[in-house]
């Protein structure tokens, strides 16, 4: 995500976009809609806020890329292995964009971003899309990035990923393959839960990929209408889809 990116290359992109009359917008689901815009939408009900937490709890046994899952995140590795996630500053860098975006939308300044990483072992072998996670290696990962406002952790992004539902039972859980939550401590307290995929809670992997793509596809006409430059969801209207019922109507009229 580009929000509040390093000014040296952000300024270059901004200048190039304006010179060429182009607009550039990025989004997704998490990071993306569920990690920032959904939370901001929920705050329209708030009188005051102590803390906003946007979180994802996901079963990622379907993800097939071993390099990302093992070397990047540490799954299937012993706890003394240092994945990319453990690189100092990586979690803060990875999640600061939605934190700064929410802060900007609410008109507050982030003093710093604090990142933490936790991992838990599996006590059994787990068959997953990229191979086998052996007993005694990492079977669940939890990251947390907290934006500090007025000295307190006020805007928090949490991410819990498991390779099986029974790993790390003391962490936040979900009956669905992927659950996105927004929890706002304030007046009033607000809690919003969003799931993707079938109603039974399965198929979230495919649904998340579709949602990620459609966040961008549905934004196209709004980005075209926007002024040249680098855009965030704060710069364009809610990206309501167009012609969204056309395909469904065609199938109803001609199911063959």
Where are these regions (language model features)?
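A short glycine/serine-rich beta->alpha loop
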Residues: 21-27, 86, 199-207
């Amino acid at each position: 995500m580009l929000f509040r990116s390093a000014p040296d290359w952000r300024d270059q992109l901004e200048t190039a976009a304006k010179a060429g009359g182009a607009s550039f917008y990025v989004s997704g689901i998490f990071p993306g809609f569920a990690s920032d815009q959904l939370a901001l939408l929920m705050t329209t009900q708030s009188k005051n806020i102590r803390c906003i937490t946007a979180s994802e709890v996901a079963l990622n046994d379907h993800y097939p890329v071993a390099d990302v899952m093992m070397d990047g995140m540490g799954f299937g590795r012993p706890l003394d292995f240092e994945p990319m996630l453990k690189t100092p500053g990586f979690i803060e860098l990875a999640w600061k964009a939605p934190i700064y975006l929410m802060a900007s939308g609410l008109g507050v300044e982030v003093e710093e971003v604090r990142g933490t990483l936790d991992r838990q072992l599996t006590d059994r072998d787990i068959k997953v899309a990229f191979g086998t996670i052996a007993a005694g290696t990492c079977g669940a990962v939890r990251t947390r990035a907290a934006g500090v406002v007025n000295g307190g952790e006020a805007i928090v992004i949490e991410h819990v990923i498991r390779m099986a539902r029974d790993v790390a039972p003391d962490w936040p859980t979900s009956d669905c393959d992927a659950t996105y939550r927004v929890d706002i401590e304030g007046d009033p307290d607000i809690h919003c839960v969003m799931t993707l995929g079938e109603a039974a809670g399965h198929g979230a992997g495919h649904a998340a990929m579709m949602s990620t793509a459609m966040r961008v596809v549905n934004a196209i006409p709004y980005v075209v209408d926007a002024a040249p430059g680098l855009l965030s969801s704060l710069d364009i209207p809610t990206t309501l889809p167009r012609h969204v019922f056309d395909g469904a109507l065609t199938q109803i009229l001609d199911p063959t």
